[in-house]
Amino acid sequence: MSNIPAELKYASSHEWVRKEEDGSYTVGISEHAQELLGDMVFVELPEVGDDVNAGEDCAVAESVKAASDIYSPLTGEVLAVNEALEDSPELVNSDAFGDGWFFRVMPSDTAELENLLDAEGYQAVIDDE
């Protein structure tokens, strides 16, 4: 069974968000998602300064099995991207909730957080797959 940290919020499309001290949110994909995809070989990230929209694709994770679109859980501006993934995409596999993060976004509407799932709700999504 996948690890689902209780302090994070989740999208049903398997992205997670973590609030940072500056009010921005770090985004990555869940341990469950990386297990389904398998070994990462390439990650395409948005650009710093890009505007992303909740529910729209903004990144791509390519594994030995498939390429998968990554959706932004929140609308806002990309403040940072995890440049370490360019040379080490396997960080998504080894540390999905830590060093394998994708990007940080400053949300334009924090009310969108209400559309995200808590750990229990996300577990229910996985169980229904």
Swiss-Prot record:
Keyword set includes Transport: no
GO BP annotations, alphabetical order: glycine decarboxylation via glycine cleavage system
Signal keyword on record: no
Cofactors demanded by this protein: (R)-lipoate
Recorded GO CC terms: cytosol; glycine cleavage complex
Keywords: Lipoyl
Record's cofactor remark: Binds 1 lipoyl cofactor covalently.
PROSITE patterns, sorted: BIOTINYL_LIPOYL, LIPOYL
CDD domains: GCS_H
Post-translational modification N6-lipoyllysine, affected residues: 65
Domain Lipoyl-binding: 24-106
Pfam families associated with the record: GCV_H
InterPro entries listed in its UniProt record: 2-oxoA_DH_lipoyl-BS (IPR003016), Biotin_lipoyl (IPR000089), GCV_H (IPR002930), GCV_H/Fam206 (IPR033753), GCV_H_sub (IPR017453), Single_hybrid_motif (IPR011053)
Function as written in the Swiss-Prot or TrEMBL entry: The glycine cleavage system catalyzes the degradation of glycine. The H protein shuttles the methylamine group of glycine from the P protein to the T protein.
Subunit structure: The glycine cleavage system is composed of four proteins: P, T, L and H.
PANTHER family: GLYCINE CLEAVAGE SYSTEM H PROTEIN (PTHR11715), GLYCINE CLEAVAGE SYSTEM H PROTEIN-RELATED (PTHR11715:SF3)
Family note: Belongs to the GcvH family.
UniProt name for this protein: Glycine cleavage system H protein
Species assigned in the record: Shewanella piezotolerans (strain WP3 / JCM 13877)
Gene name, Swiss-Prot/TrEMBL: gcvH
